[in-house]
Amino acid sequence: MPQPARWTGHTRGTPGVSTSSCSNRGNTTDPTYLEYHDYYWGQPIYDSKELFKLMALESQHAGLSWLTILKKKESYEQAFYNFEPQFIAQMTEKDIDHLMKFPNIIHNRKKLEAIVSQAKGYLKIEKDYGSFSKFLWSYVNHQPINMGYKKPRDRKKVDQRATQLSKDL
């Protein structure tokens, strides 16, 4: 199995240096979070498998800090075949039982089963629409949206496009 990949995406500079005034960075000095923030967060992603990985990790995030999940990313990559949907979709109850003991991942059966379900959905979308990425990006006319937020507190809690996408998924 290939080694877990580092975050892909476009660089915005040296981690922890170039974006120190960004309000989305928070007060953290954790190198894992700074690398994610400076190289990945806010960058458009068009690779279907990379989007699948992010969706799977986000599903583990519910009720936990994002830093908790970031620190477990490599373990999730090992546990879930480097986020290769065609392998994950074939996982069974027995595989989930094994993952409930796998080190350094969240041992919540429903969350682990969610990744398997997401892989099956990913494969269906790839078949029906030709690309998971194109399907997701179609909700925003294939362009990143600048919501114009100056401060984190200005962010909307709910966006109608996100609500519709959630329903469609």
Model-identified regions with their sequence ranges:
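HhH-family (HhH-GPD) DNA N-glycosylase catalytic core used in base-excision repair
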Residues: 2-169
